Amino acid sequence: MGKVYDWFEERLEIQAIADDISSKYVPPHVNIFYCLGGITFTCFLLQVASGFAMTFYYRPTVAEAFASVQYIMTDVNFGWLIRSVHRWSASMMVLTMILHVFRVYLTGGFKKPRELTWVTGVILAVLTVSFGVTGYSLPWDQVGYWAVKIVTGVPDAIPVIGSPLVELLRGSVSVGQSTLTRFYSLHTFILPLLTAVFMLMHFLMIRKQGISGPL
């Protein structure tokens, strides 16, 4: 085992990386509220794991979506638990994200030189809410259907570009299969990819600049 470690150490300098991670200075004023960002990230990982598990059984069609969700809940081994974890961690992610934003704002963590860290955080907050909007419609029950109909109809009030925006969101004039397909693609591919990219940027900036000092 030692020879294997030495082989990797010689090429990747693993010990230097480990020392850098473990020796990062943590200011004495840091308390439990500074963990909210990490809790949000943990919830995101739970979302990815449980969501990936459900893609094996979920069918993104208006005719089969609701039945496939019912199948997950009643017939798939531990399916009810996987979906419940997905829902609970989604709610927890939104809650901890909001608390994290408030904590950063109230402690002045958005000030120079951390403006870009704040910007990436705000973008992540928007992406988190977008997860909720797109995921809410996927069971394609009455609640999900009318929710997506209302949400996609909001831009219609914008002059000139309102109607084209509604059609872009829905995939057609009315809510239907095209809408569900778009929301499924957003929820399972586009939003997770964007979130991963901005989280990486967010973490690298925090790593570079460190935790902000007290007010």
From Swiss-Prot:
It comes from the Eukaryota. The chain crosses the membrane at residues 32-52, 90-110, 116-136, 186-206. It is a multi-pass membrane protein. It is found in: Plastid, Chloroplast thylakoid membrane. Heme b 1 binds at residues 100, 202. GO terms for molecular function: electron transporter, transferring electrons within cytochrome b6/f complex of photosystem II activity; metal ion binding; oxidoreductase activity. Binds 2 heme b groups non-covalently with two histidine residues as axial ligands. Binds one heme group covalently by a single cysteine link with no axial amino acid ligand. This heme was named heme ci. One of its GO terms (cellular component) is chloroplast thylakoid membrane. SUPFAM superfamilies: Transmembrane di-heme cytochromes. GO terms for biological process: photosynthesis; respiratory electron transport chain. Heme c binds at residue 35. Keywords: Chloroplast, Electron transport, Heme, Iron, Membrane, Metal-binding, Photosynthesis, Plastid, Thylakoid, Transmembrane, Transmembrane helix, Transport. Its cofactor is heme b; heme c. Component of the cytochrome b6-f complex, which mediates electron transfer between photosystem II (PSII) and photosystem I (PSI), cyclic electron flow around PSI, and state transitions. The 4 large subunits of the cytochrome b6-f complex are cytochrome b6, subunit IV (17 kDa polypeptide, PetD), cytochrome f and the Rieske protein, while the 4 small subunits are PetG, PetL, PetM and PetN. The complex functions as a dimer. This is Cytochrome b6. It comes from Coleochaete orbicularis (Charophycean green alga).
